[in-house]
């Protein structure tokens, strides 16, 4: 039997037919928090926009940020109001920690994930590669 195509030429041909987005690594960049201190409170003006960008529930995301900062707070429209003075850098660091723990897939690094509950355990399930990782309940 004659082999008309060798493996490398088939692989090259298949890769050429894939869209450019598949090969890009910088497709997911979180918008930085637009925060300021007003009196003894810190206000994040674009909090709901950040949660929507990550495709996460704003209430659960707010709960995580408040827990990590060790403070109380409240959602007011699209803003999150935190009790206490927190710098821009600290707020963005907590947001990035949330992204690393609850948004990005640990296997492929893509943000195409959902938090699913199976039994009593919450999992981070990747829709891109199918990987599942147990995560802490908020």
UniProtKB/Swiss-Prot annotation:
A matching Pfam family: eIF-5_eIF-2B
An example Gene Ontology molecular-function term: translation initiation factor activity
Domain of life of the native organism: Archaea
Record keyword Lipid metabolism present: no
Transmembrane segments: none
Keyword Protein biosynthesis assigned: yes
Keywords assigned by UniProt, alphabetized: Initiation factor, Protein biosynthesis
Classification via InterPro entries: IF2/IF5 (IPR045196), TIF2_bsu_arc (IPR004458), Transl_init_fac_IF2/IF5_dom (IPR002735), Transl_init_fac_IF2/IF5_N (IPR016189), Transl_init_fac_IF2/IF5_Zn-bd (IPR016190)
Complex and partners: Heterotrimer composed of an alpha, a beta and a gamma chain.
Annotated HAMAP family: eIF_2_beta (MF_00232)
Known function: eIF-2 functions in the early steps of protein synthesis by forming a ternary complex with GTP and initiator tRNA.
Family membership noted in the UniProt record: Belongs to the eIF-2-beta/eIF-5 family.
Protein name in the entry: Translation initiation factor 2 subunit beta
Species this protein is from: Methanococcus maripaludis (strain C7 / ATCC BAA-1331)
The encoding gene: eif2b
């Amino acid at each position: 039997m004659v082999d008309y195509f060798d493996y490398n030429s088939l692989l090259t041909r298949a890769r050429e037919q894939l869209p450019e987005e598949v090969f890009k690594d910088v497709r997911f960049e979180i918008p930085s928090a637009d925060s300021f201190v007003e009196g003894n409170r810190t206000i994040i003006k674009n909090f709901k926009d950040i949660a929507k960008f990550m495709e996460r529930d704003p209430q659960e995301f707010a709960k995580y940020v408040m827990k990590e900062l060790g403070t109380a707070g409240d959602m007011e429209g699209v803003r999150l109001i935190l009790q206490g003075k927190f710098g821009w850098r600290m707020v963005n660091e907590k947001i990035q920690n949330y992204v690393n723990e609850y948004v990005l897939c640990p296997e492929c690094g893509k943000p195409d994930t959902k938090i699913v509950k199976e039994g009593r355990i919450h999992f981070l399930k990747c829709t891109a590669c199918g990987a599942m990782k147990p995560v802490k309940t908020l």
